Design a protein with these regions (language model features):
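Aromatic-lined carbohydrate-binding/catalytic grooves of carbohydrate-active enzymes
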Residues: 1-93, 106
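Generic structural signal for hydrophobic
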Residues: 33, 98-99, 141, 224
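Glycan-recognition surfaces
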Residues: 50-89, 93, 131-232
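Active-site beta-loop-alpha junctions enriched in small/polar residues
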Residues: 1-2, 45-49, 112-114, 153-157
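Hydrophobic faces of well-ordered beta-strands that scaffold small-molecule active sites
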Residues: 40-44, 107-109, 151-152, 231
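Alpha-helix-loop-beta-strand connector modules within alpha/beta enzyme cores
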Residues: 24-36, 128-145
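Short glycine-enriched, charge-decorated loop/helix-capping segments at active-site entrances
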Residues: 15, 123-125
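Active-site groove signature of glycoside hydrolases
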Residues: 1-2, 90-122
């Protein structure tokens, strides 16, 4: 929905509506969603940026990197350094802008790469500064937009921890939506965390063909009832 995002190689970090995809803006889509009796949600990945983006071209110094070394890409993207006050301000202002402009009830906050280009000897406390800034942003959003639910996601369940549980409404615990596998994933999750915070989607994806055929829909829904169920593609 944003920037020049036609693949995972470009546009990440440019959080403005793509006019080719939405010539009438997001409002038309939001109105259609509301007409169907649903609230509107949006996917964002505020911590990452593509090298091929207006944001990175304007601020190449905003990413985590080690002096004298070429920064690493994962999934064709760098990681913004939230430990820099100007980056923290940018992310918070961007999210405030979206939530003040559009009738958004839900944000899926994704994070699709590991934190590389940091080490204690060369960038002391870089991880801590990043996470504390993330917490400040989430705390501010919760205070200013109490009716907006944020789901924490990170390549699956890499963001499941107590710090995020305090600040988000739900966790995306795994990209694996196979109902048989989910029974084990969900059991492990609920040993520590509340089932109501666990997103459990029913999808039309076949089960692992090496072991099982396509699962019965009733089975899929029964498995999803172990947490907060949803329906996805």
């Amino acid at each position: 929905w944003f920037g020049a995002r036609y693949s995972d190689r470009a546009g990440l970090g440019d959080w403005t509506v793509n006019p080719e995809k939405f010539p009438n803006g997001l409002e038309e889509l939001i109105d259609r969603v509301h007409a169907l009796g649903m609230d509107f949600g949006l996917w964002v990945e505020p911590e990452s940026v593509n090298p091929d983006s207006d944001l990175y071209r304007a601020h190449p110094d905003w990413i985590h990197k080690l002096d004298g070394r070429e920064p690493l890409t994962q999934r064709n993207q760098y990681l913004l350094d939230f430990g820099k006050p100007e980056v923290e301000r940018f992310a918070l202002d961007m999210l405030r802008g979206l939530l003040n402009t559009y009738a958004i009830r839900y944000l899926k906050w994704d994070m699709n790469r590991a934190m590389t280009d940091v080490c204690e000897s060369l960038t002391p406390f870089a991880r801590e500064r990043h996470v504390l800034a993330l917490y400040r942003i989430l705390d501010a959003l919760e205070k200013e937009f109490p009716d907006v639910d944020i789901e924490a996601c990170s390549g699956g369940g890499a963001r499941v921890d107590l710090g995020m549980a305090k600040r988000t409404a739900q966790f995306w615990v795994s990209d694996n939506t196979d109902p048989f596998d989910r029974l084990f994933i969900q059991e492990g999750y609920t040993l520590m965390y509340a089932p109501m915070m666990m997103s459990c989607w029913v999808t039309d994806t076949p089960a692992d063909g090496r072991r099982r055929g396509r699962a019965d829909w009733r089975y899929k829904f029964h498995a999803a009832m172990g947490g907060t169920p949803g329906v996805g593609a």
